[in-house]
């Protein structure tokens, strides 16, 4: 067993993400029995001493049958209606499954906006931490009834990566109908090569990922992107089939493992890099790009050539090179109107109260 798999096997805390396809029959019907089986595997891991938070998809799928729908809805309003009905069935199923072991579950509904706003981000963290302290099993799902774009992409893959860092988890396990990463879709390509471990970009050379299924929205592209996000933040990831949940959660002997970076990213830098929504963008000249990206220095107004969006001091902004390609993200020290009058000017030309960096090096994260 590699050190990367061993890190997941010995993790004292983890997030387990359960995809929609892991909770439905081949015909697309929500299956509480499948959910109970996954709860058994998760319970075994918790009984061994690991603290587990569950990110569960499946609300929309669970709402299809009660509403008399013939298939997963495609329009947003019906998706949200199905989610509102299905979320009840989903949480009740998790509650019943863990009640067999004397455990209580708590429901936490989040949206991308909740994670992106610093105050809500902190509140979500406190809630999850308190649930764990009270020995309740947190069941996290995207708040589909109010989500817009987020409801259509990701199937909670990205949310699970964000939650893993949010709660300080030592591992993330993604369970779906896919048994790992291949260089192409094994269901369509004969001889598709299985990739057991991803330690760097070279392991992904030539990988062709596909879109999501009809029932879920998170295809291999979403899973791979989310796994890389978590790994870059310092959380090792295991991508495995729900059918192999027992092995995945016991000894991490199945699936594809994504190695984590050696040093875990701080909570603030992670929020700036991945969680926060950029309120605007600053275009930099070549000298400023070198200073920010390669020398890890603060961004001064002199290196800014353009300002876009409407933002305020304390917001996160995207930093772009002359070619408009994003090079970093950071917390800006001025609002849009102030910075528009300061850009391109040296610090010595500015009044004393405007001589702070536009973005301090401590608040910068290269992308």
UniProtKB/Swiss-Prot annotation:
Any single GO CC term annotated in Swiss-Prot or TrEMBL for this entry: cytosol
GO molecular function, one term: RNA binding
EC identifiers of the protein: 2.7.2.11
Chief site of localization: cytoplasm
Taxonomy, superkingdom: Bacteria
A Pfam family assignment: PUA
Binding site for ATP: 17, 176-177, 217-223
Binding residue positions for substrate: 57, 144, 156
Pathway annotation: Amino-acid biosynthesis; L-proline biosynthesis; L-glutamate 5-semialdehyde from L-glutamate: step 1/2
Family classification: Belongs to the glutamate 5-kinase family.
The name this protein goes by in its record: Glutamate 5-kinase
């Amino acid at each position: 067993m590699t050190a990367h798999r061993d890190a997941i096997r010995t993790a004292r805390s983890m997030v387990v993400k359960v995809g929609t396809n892991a909770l439905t029959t081949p015909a697309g019907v929500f299956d509480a029995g499948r959910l109970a089986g996954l709860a058994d595997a998760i319970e075994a891991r918790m009984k061994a001493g690991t603290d587990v938070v569950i990110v569960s998809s499946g609300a929309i799928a669970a709402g299809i049958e009660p509403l008399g729908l013939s298939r997963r809805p495609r329009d947003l309003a019906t998706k949200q209606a199905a989610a509102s009905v299905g979320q009840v069935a989903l949480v009740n199923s998790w509650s019943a499954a863990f009640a067999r072991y004397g455990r209580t579950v708590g429901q936490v509904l989040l949206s991308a906006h909740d994670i992106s706003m610093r105050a809500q981000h902190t509140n979500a963290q406190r809630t999850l931490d308190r649930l764990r302290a009270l020995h309740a099993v947190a069941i996290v799902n995207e708040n589909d009834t109010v989500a817009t774009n987020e409801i259509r992409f990701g199937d909670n893959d990205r949310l699970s990566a964000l939650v893993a860092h949010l709660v300080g988890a030592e591992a993330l396990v993604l369970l779906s109908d896919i048994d790992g990463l291949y260089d192409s879709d094994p269901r369509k390509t004969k001889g598709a090569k299985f990739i057991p471990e991803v330690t760097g970009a070279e392991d992904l050379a030539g990988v062709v990922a596909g879109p999501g299924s009809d029932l879920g929205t998170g295809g291999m592209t979403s899973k791979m992107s989310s796994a890389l996000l978590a790994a870059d933040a310092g959380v090792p990831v295991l991508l495995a089939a729900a059918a192999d949940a027992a092995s995945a959660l016991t000894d991490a002997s199945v699936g594809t493992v994504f190695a984590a970076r050696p040093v875990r990213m701080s909570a603030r830098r992670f929020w700036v890099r991945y969680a926060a929504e950029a309120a605007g963008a600053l275009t930099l000249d070549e000298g400023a790009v070198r200073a920010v990206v390669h020398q890890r220095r603060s961004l001064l107004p002199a290196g800014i050539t353009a300002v876009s969006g409407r933002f305020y001091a304390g917001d996160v902004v995207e930093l772009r090179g002359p070619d408009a390609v994003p090079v970093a993200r950071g917390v800006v020290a001025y609002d849009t109107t102030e910075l528009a009058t300061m850009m391109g000017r040296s610090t010595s030309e500015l009044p004393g109260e405007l001589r702070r960096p536009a973005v301090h090096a401590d608040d910068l994260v290269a992308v």
